[in-house]
Amino acid sequence: MALVPCQVLRVAILLSYCSILCNYKAIEMPSHQTYGGSWKFLTFIDLVIQAVFFGICVLTDLSSLLTRGSGNQEQERQLRKLISLRDWTLAVLAFPVGVFVVAVFWTIYAYDREMIYPRLLDNFIPGWLNHGMHTTVLPFILIEMRTSHHQYPSRSSGLAAICTFSVGYILWVCWIHHVTGMWVYPFLEHIGSGARIIFFGSTTILMNFLYLLGEVLNSYIWDTQRSIEEEKEKPKLE
């Protein structure tokens, strides 16, 4: 019985991300017309990651319903592949990148919003859309982690993957600066080269920490759930 609400919830989250992406892309901002377009912003990349992840979740749920009780080994094999892809995407991309975007954005915003989200953007981006991009990502991914168990990859391969993503994005940001002479984020203009190197190194370390945090949190949630279920199954002493 719990499967149906989870399916509906995932569909709702997927539709919300599609709505956010469509509304964001419909905004005519000068930055969208420059080199790299929306793809130079980690927020936009994260939105795409979250939409793809929940799309995989919905597809996995549909496949699970269709293959249940069929006894078709090929369909079950394809379902296992989908589940593995879903779990890998959450572990390596959806959780660490999503939490990173929320945590770093609001930390810098609280210190000085002009360094990350200038007031000028209020003329283009409504408040609800800003929260859709930088706030609701966190509760959505935590809800998913709580409602379904996810098998994390080996720690070495997971950390290697998130490091590859982090370094790849840093190189992309540096390349954009090389081509345009402008940094993607305003605060990078106000710090020296040494501070930028420290910042980029720190972001990579933080991404690795968030990967490990997701792994620990996933284990804690489901070890606790397993313990509760085992306690319920124990015969009650009269």
Swiss-Prot record:
Annotated positions for site Important for catalytic activity: T43, H134
Membrane topology category: Multi-pass membrane protein
Entry EC number(s): 3.1.-.-
Domain of life: Eukaryota
Residue ranges annotated as Cytoplasmic topological domain: 1-12, 68-87, 145-156, 217-238
Gene Ontology annotations of biological process type: long-chain fatty acid catabolic process
Primary enzyme class: hydrolase
Protein name, entry field: Androgen-induced gene 1 protein
Species of provenance: Mus musculus (Mouse)
